[in-house]
Amino acid sequence: MITHGCYTRTRHKHKLKKTLIMLSAGLGLFFYVNQNSFANGENYFKLGSDSKLLTHDSYQNRLFYTLKTGETVADLSKSQDINLSTIWSLNKHLYSSESEMMKAAPGQQIILPLKKLPFEYSALPLLGSAPLVAAGGVAGHTNKLTKMSPDVTKSNMTDDKALNYAAQQAASLGSQLQSRSLNGDYAKDTALGIAGNQASSQLQAWLQHYGTAEVNLQSGNNFDGSSLDFLLPFYDSEKMLAFGQVGARYIDSRFTANLGAGQRFFLPANMLGYNVFIDQDFSGDNTRLGIGGEYWRDYFKSSVNGYFRMSGWHESYNKKDYDERPANGFDIRFNGYLPSYPALGAKLIYEQYYGDNVALFNSDKLQSNPGAATVGVNYTPIPLVTMGIDYRHGTGNENDLLYSMQFRYQFDKSWSQQIEPQYVNELRTLSGSRYDLVQRNNNIILEYKKQDILSLNIPHDINGTEHSTQKIQLIVKSKYGLDRIVWDDSALRSQGGQIQHSGSQSAQDYQAILPAYVQGGSNIYKVTARAYDRNGNSSNNVQLTITVLSNGQVVDQVGVTDFTADKTSAKADNADTITYTATVKKNGVAQANVPVSFNIVSGTATLGANSAKTDANGKATVTLKSSTPGQVVVSAKTAEMTSALNASAVIFFDQTKASITEIKADKTTAVANGKDAIKYTVKVMKNGQPVNNQSVTFSTNFGMFNGKSQTQATTGNDGRATITLTSSSAGKATVSATVSDGAEVKATEVTFFDELKIDNKVDIIGNNVRGELPNIWLQYGQFKLKASGGDGTYSWYSENTSIATVDASGKVTLNGKGSVVIKATSGDKQTVSYTIKAPSYMIKVDKQAYYADAMSICKNLLPSTQTVLSDIYDSWGAANKYSHYSSMNSITAWIKQTSSEQRSGVSSTYNLITQNPLPGVNVNTPNVYAVCVE
């Protein structure tokens, strides 16, 4: 049968040439595997144009015979010596009763057993020749042998030669198709010519005699959605069918071929079968293995198929920036029909595929391990036409609705048998579907994987001293070029540090501004980065670890990074101990088995040991005790350290007296503005209990306690007394406290810094002019901001790098037109802002172009006069004084034409490096730049 179908799906581009080549290859295979059957020659001939052969499981040879005028079934029975009961057994499905068959009129068809008919010659016709006619056929039929090739008509012509000749004809057809470059109109004309050619119709008819041919031709969208399939038996007996199946299809702009083989075993009431297929996607270079099983009965079909990839990851044929490969999976299919109403059928399909990004529905909707169930109904009012509707529902509520109409033309049946409803029933029986195509998914379902088009790597962590600037080494691999890197440095910013762009033209040139070292803190910060390319793709997140060292530490040195006590005070009874812990690291990594020496810097006390080795965590401990009240400072040092690291002072106190056991400040720095205060708190204890209403005397060597250098405060119920210290000038202060005749204790030194400021005047890099920022800009022009106050170390930050970037020295680069805020943070955590206001205009140097092209590039926004550019030169100096233009010796720019210049074909120019204003320059002069005004 030949089946034509039409569907509602939209398809794309068709490669007709590949389809026809694949068809020729399939036919060549068919002739090869069937050469023994053809050589036998018993069943392959025709008896006139209206009598055709049909292979059958019960009667291997049947003849469809059209009654002539004056003929009856009884006449045939008598003249051909065929029993009437035999004829009736072959025609039960054509006539309602034997009596109706006997009344068959001229023009109606009767099926006769062909083995009863004598013949003298049988052979395979040549492509394009008229049908061969068997001698001694049915009365009234001509038995004339038509003209053939001389070799074929010779008396010694063998069946093998006939086979070889036919195979050569098929191969020749394929070769012709291969040698042509088929375009749209030519392909259509060629297809129509082949369809109308006698050789083609003979070829289709022969194939129909020995299997099933199904053609689905989509005429719209360049034939996308079209397919051809052939099931070709190469061994056929009543109980077993061995077959090959070839197919080709062009769906979703992919050309796919299928080649398979299988066996079907027929039992009295059912059929069991298996098959193996190789599926090849020639467009995308994907290969898949399919293994399937079948179980059929009358009015029922079921099959199960497994699909296994045979090709790996490679660049996708039609999905940009993705790799693809076949997805492994399976499906289970059921088809059923009502015996009482065989025109109505139903189907059920479940399919499951495996992979992270599988395109079960389409390549734009990728899913993980998707599955789908399909239910459908179809209606076949006559054998020629089948209409259906399928609904598929899958993972993630994806769904698909398909309407279809198929036209099935069977060459082995008369026209009347294809348009009358009573013949539908035969299609649903086991015998009638013996040569049906294997039910499977011939399209390769694909799995996709995003290509590594953009990757970011930071090979080294950063270790540096406080307030230092450290360059960040980045490794970026990008298919489309790096656009920007986005950082999350919130942890670093919380302590006064930051990640910032260096101000160069490279999008990956970043540096870390390290915060102050925090005594007793972790001083380890985690920041993350993500890269973006020019197409909007993003990389993976990458983490950078930054370790801040104190000023006394050296990078790559095995040294003490932390030295702390477990408590701030102890009883001066020579028994109560304070335990110190020293942490030893190298570049942020803990170091084991490192000797650490300990020493008493000030005060009177006794160490438990003078040295200790670090454990697996890089920690070494020592104890301290004393019998003398007072403060004690202890230090720790490794052999590689040039200076020791001091711990905070601890207090030993006489518990029998009211004694200060703790003194601390709430911060170590403050602004020297007379308002920013540092609060001190002392705690007074006696016999382990807080002392209430105890007078405490505070004194300072710098700053004031409410206008005084010495003052008193009284403790509360919790034994605590507080006081605040301010200063109107920068300097360092040490506060001490005493109670009655107790020992004096001192707090850690604090610092007052001048208020952080940014000067409103800027330094223009190109002309060394200091003044207000010009309100007309040169793109990539640079100026320097000057900060003062704070601790003297500053980190800079731009809130919008597309407008301006700023480097570690405060040098600003103007990238685009707009307003932006630049912030500076000092090491003592003061922050100040500088607002850059949008200019009245900015000029942008593009590329060299003729005047007309320059107008197009700038969208007609060229400088209106030479003055526009001379003002830029006066404000910013020569353009090549800036890093972006440093390699250029000349930037001659077009000026927008006046009306008179337009008539003359000339324009004016101005050079942004040498000035040199010129009038009357020909508009086709090369080496002149398009400089746009924004």
UniProtKB/Swiss-Prot annotation:
Cited InterPro entries: Big_1_dom (IPR003344), Big_2 (IPR003343), C-type_lectin-like/link_sf (IPR016186), CTDL_fold (IPR016187), IAT_beta (IPR024519), IAT_beta_sf (IPR038177), Ig-like_fold (IPR013783), Intimin-Invasin_domain (IPR051715)
LysM domain ranges (all copies): 63-112
One example of a Gene Ontology biological process annotation: cell adhesion
Residue ranges of the region described as Required for periplasmic localization: 40-212
Effect of mutating D436A: Disrupted salt-bridge between the beta-barrel and the linker, but no effect since acts as the wild-type intimin construct consisting of residues 1-530
Primary subcellular site in the record, as a coarse category: membrane
Pfam short name (any one): LysM
Remaining remarks: 'Inverse' autotransporters have an N-terminal translocation domain followed by the passenger domain, as opposed to 'classical' autotransporters which have N-terminal passenger and C-terminal translocation domains.
Protein name: Intimin
